[in-house]
């Protein structure tokens, strides 16, 4: 072979290798021959120039999870119960898209779990014991988790927990006979119709599997009740069937909104967290939905194959979404209860609050508090306010003090306010009462150096300093006002360079940020909404103004707390409060002492937040701790809750005079006030302002 031919051959092989490397694929896991047939149809009809679809067949969902985890497959669409199971070890899968059952303009990513019975039967919900039951599958949402959880909650089903017997054994004693595909207890497989090894398998190889299968079990007179979704019963059969309501009434199939077991999250597409394939899967499915020949949501070989037939589209989930946030705290905790048993109320024994800290300095202060509190306070670690919110949602922490902007997010994620900070040292009367209607407030202000030419009316192109994206005084108020006045959602293009911790580190909103000057190697922490960014928070925004910016957005006390010798840090020790002024919304300026007349807004105080069922416990303990370590506490010489060493505003704002208990049942919106709540809601319509956690918590409302 001559040299030129060898070179040509090598180049051809190299080109082939590069082509193979560039070819992207999505390997879909299917669980039956009927799903495999549909998948092969999709391979032929859902062509994509850059991404190839292929099919991987396994016997059941668990095998698919293993295949995805071991990189033999990439994706599967499952119900909420399996979203939860797939997120656990050893699978570590995450949801990336949700089925939409509404329309392309009005999405609905939830469905209803219902109990379907024949009209000819006469029993009520409370008379389910000793009836024959048809279920979609073990661990599935509508067919198992919701109904079994409800039976336990209503104390119709007796189960002392896994230490006494398995949940399956307890359920097998409750129903006369059942078909629960995937169950191990023989009596729960008694009604199933699969042949040989396929009997009671958790796949379409079992005729009574899934929604259509559970309904067929009822149709075939094998069962007395089928636990399915609201759209399972075909319209032509509505005249013969009705819904069993938890209040012991019955209603027509069409009245599912008033007669259901629960409204639950949609089915979701799962993939690996490791070597993330999300982008390819989402891109393929989005393109597939645009192709008329590609029938993702029809099942010519059965029912609900690969996706539910009632789905109209697939919607990408926010990047911050995990299985817990997708399912919601109530449903996630309900599934956990099915594993551990319903615990007796132990609120009397709960004598501690786990406080979430957001920096090393906060953790140090919290550890000191723990030591002297006699175990009433424990500490958890996080690096941002949003991480603390998630910890509380997941039950890993109990409380944290938040700024109004983060409180807005926390409220939409399901947390409630417990204790509000109070700042007015000229009127301490509310602090001396056991109950008070007073509310703490502070002022959002725009701070500038005296002698500069900046005014509120000429902020275009100005270098700005913010406490963090999503915080009240440093972002929501000033950016909301500017956005409202200019009609421009693109705040980054309006101002010059900024430091707005929490922004995209590559954007000009992070251009002024410096990270932690003492840890230069941690460049990844630059612009982090945490103490890892030197320009984070009130004092951080003021430092940014001093060193780099032209205007700083903070609270009315920020200048006083960092000047005239109040802050010994090198950047602040020589600063004089008289060298700074406030920008007024009317275009004028005022001394920093005139904050009540020259401010951007009066805003709600920071507050302690927790889960609704922890509210009384947290309030009781914090009130007690304040009586000991507050400004007038009996043991304030040992520890002071509202004083910070090694930092500013640690755990609570240093300007806090006391914490006022917020009346029980007060919602987050009521505490923040309609005006502020509406302002933040409007600001969040600008996509650049909406945090990942907020997007996840508001994705759907089941």
From Swiss-Prot:
It is found in: Secreted. Plasma. Hydrogencarbonate 2 binds at residues 467, 471, 473-474. It comes from the Eukaryota. Fe(3+) 1 binds at residues 79, 111, 211, 267. The keyword Metal-binding applies. GO terms for molecular function: metal ion binding. Hydrogencarbonate 1 binds at residues 136, 140, 142-143. Keywords: Disulfide bond, Ion transport, Iron, Iron transport, Metal-binding, Repeat, Secreted, Signal, Transport. Monomer. Transferrins are iron binding transport proteins which can bind two Fe(3+) ions in association with the binding of an anion, usually bicarbonate. It is responsible for the transport of iron from sites of absorption and heme degradation to those of storage and utilization. Serum transferrin may also have a further role in stimulating cell proliferation. Belongs to the transferrin family. This is Serotransferrin-A. The gene is tf-a.
């Amino acid at each position: 072979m001559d040299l030129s031919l060898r070179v040509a051959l090598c180049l051809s092989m190299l080109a082939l290798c590069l082509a193979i490397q560039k070819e992207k694929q999505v390997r879909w896991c299917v669980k039956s021959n009927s799903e495999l047939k549909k998948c092969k149809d999709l391979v032929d009809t859902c062509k994509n120039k850059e991404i190839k679809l292929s099919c991987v067949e396994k016997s059941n969902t668990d095998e698919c999870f293993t295949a995805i985890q071991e990189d033999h497959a990439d994706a599967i669409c499952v119900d909420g119960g399996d979203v939860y199971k797939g997120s656990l070890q050893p699978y570590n899968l995450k949801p990336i898209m949700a089925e939409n059952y509404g329309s392309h303009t009005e999405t609905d990513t939830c469905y209803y779990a219902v109990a379907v019975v024949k009209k000819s039967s006469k029993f009520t919900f409370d008379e389910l014991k000793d009836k024959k039951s048809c279920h979609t599958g073990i661990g599935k949402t509508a067919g198992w988790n919701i109904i079994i959880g409800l039976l336990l909650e209503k104390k119709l089903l007796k189960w002392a927990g896994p230490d006494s017997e398995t949940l399956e054994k307890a359920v097998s004693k409750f129903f006369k006979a059942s078909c629960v595909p995937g169950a191990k207890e023989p009596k729960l497989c008694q009604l199933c119709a699969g042949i040989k090894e396929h009997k009671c398998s958790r796949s379409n190889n079992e005729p009574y599997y899934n929604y259509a299968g559970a309904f067929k079990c009822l149709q075939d007179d094998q069962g007395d009740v089928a636990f399915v979704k609201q759209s399972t019963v075909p319209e032509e059969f509505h005249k013969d069937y009705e819904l069993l309501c938890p209040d012991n009434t019955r209603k027509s199939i069409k009245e599912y909104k008033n007669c259901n077991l629960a409204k639950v999250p949609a089915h979701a597409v799962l993939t690996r967290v490791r070597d993330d394939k999300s982008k390819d899967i989402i891109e393929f499915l989005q393109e597939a939905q645009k192709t008329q020949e590609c029938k993702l949501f029809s099942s010519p070989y059965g029912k609900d194959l690969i996706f539910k037939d009632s789905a109209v589209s697939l919607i990408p989930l926010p990047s911050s979404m995990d299985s817990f946030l997708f399912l919601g705290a109530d449903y996630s905790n309900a599934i956990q209860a099915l594993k551990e048993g319903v615990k007796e109320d132990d609120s009397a024994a709960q004598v501690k609050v786990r406080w979430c800290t957001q920096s090393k300095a906060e953790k140090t202060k919290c550890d000191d508090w723990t030591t002297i509190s006699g175990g009433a306070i424990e500490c958890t670690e996080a690096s941002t306010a949003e991480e603390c919110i998630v910890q509380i949602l997941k039950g890993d922490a109990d409380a944290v003090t938040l700024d109004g902007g983060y409180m807005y997010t926390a409220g939409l994620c399901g947390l409630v306010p417990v204790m509000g900070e109070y700042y007015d040292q000229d009127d301490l009367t509310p602090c001396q009462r056991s109950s008070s209607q007073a509310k703490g407030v502070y002022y959002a202000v725009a701070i500038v150096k005296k002698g500069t030419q900046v005014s509120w009316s000429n902020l275009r192109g100005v270098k700005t300093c913010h406490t963090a994206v999503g915080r009240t005084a440093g972002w929501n108020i000033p950016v909301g006002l500017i956005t409202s006045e200019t009609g421009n959602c693109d705040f980054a293009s309006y101002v010059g360079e900024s430091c707005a911790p929490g922004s995209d580190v590559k954007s000009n909103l992070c251009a002024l940020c410096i990270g932690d000057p003492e840890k230069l190697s941690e460049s990844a922490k630059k612009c982090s909404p945490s103490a890892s960014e030197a320009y984070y928070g009130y004092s951080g925004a003021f430092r940014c103004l001093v060193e780099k910016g032209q205007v700083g957005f903070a609270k009315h006390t920020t200048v006083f707390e960092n000047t005239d010798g109040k802050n010994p840090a090198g950047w602040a020790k020589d600063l004089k409060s008289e060298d700074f002024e406030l920008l007024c919304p009317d275009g004028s300026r005022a001394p920093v002492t005139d904050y009540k007349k020259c401010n951007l807004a009066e805003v709600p105080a920071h507050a302690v937040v927790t889960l609704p069922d922890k509210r009384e416990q947290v309030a009781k303990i914090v009130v007690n701790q304040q009586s000991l370590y507050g400004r007038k506490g009996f043991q304030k010489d040992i520890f002071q809750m509202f004083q910070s060493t090694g930092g500013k505003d640690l755990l609570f704002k240093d300007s806090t005079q006391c914490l006022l208990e917020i009346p029980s049942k007060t919602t987050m919106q009521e505490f923040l006030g309609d005006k502020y709540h509406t302002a933040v809601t409007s600001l969040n319509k600008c996509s650049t302002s909406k945090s990942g956690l907020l997007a996840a918590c508001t994705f759907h409302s089941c």
